[in-house]
Amino acid sequence: MILHGRQRAVAALGLRPDSQVLEIGCGTGLNFRHILAYLAPAAGRLTGLDFSADMLDQARKRVAARGWLNVDLVQADATQLDLGRRFDAIFFGYSLTMIPDWPAALRQARVHLRPGGTVVVLDFSRFHGWGPLAPLWRGWLRLNHVETLRPYEDEMRRLFEPCEVRYWLGGYNFTAVGRVGP
């Protein structure tokens, strides 16, 4: 329940077998299996990016244990990217709310997205509809460096056209699916 909706969000990327995918804030690689299910091992490629070397060490172990040969791991700051290439799809899976300069991370995602590409953000929302429990959840998440009271959806709509935002589980989380024109 804590990290609800990963499969649905990855499906919204609209991946093809030959897609080139970037996951920003990949952490330990928990989303890799969902993404790789859509990619052909010889044609599609997944690049996992994270700021934390410790998280990437765990992701590296996961990749090696499963024998995934079409996964690259990069340690970098999502707000200052220069990967030298563009991607068909970019995914933020419960990571945007942990990035202090999150607008810069979204701008960098836009720069690294190919024309016609898709960016999907799946993250915690404001918990509207949770009544007196909302501040408790937000406080607990803040202890874990997750900030939910920022206008993520508004920035997505500003940067990506079209952009569709949906809320799930009474405002527990949201998906924002944005595109960059042809």
What are these regions (language model features)?
Residues 176-182:
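C-terminal lobe and adjacent flexible extensions of AdoMet/dcAdoMet transferase-like proteins
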Residues 22-24, 28-80:
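Class I SAM-dependent methyltransferase SAM/SAH-binding core
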Residues 120-174:
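C-terminal alpha-helical "lid/dimerization" subdomain adjacent to the S-adenosyl-L-methionine
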Residues 18, 42, 113-118:
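Short glycine-dipeptide loop
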Residues 89-101:
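A short SAM/SAH-binding and catalytic strip from SAM-dependent methyltransferases
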Residues 79-90:
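A short acidic, Gly/Pro-enriched loop at the edge of an enzyme's catalytic core
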Residues 1-17, 34:
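Conserved alpha-helix/loop element of class I SAM-dependent methyltransferases that forms part
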Residues 103-115:
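A short glycine-rich, Lys/Arg-flanked "PGG" loop and its adjoining helix->strand segment in the class I
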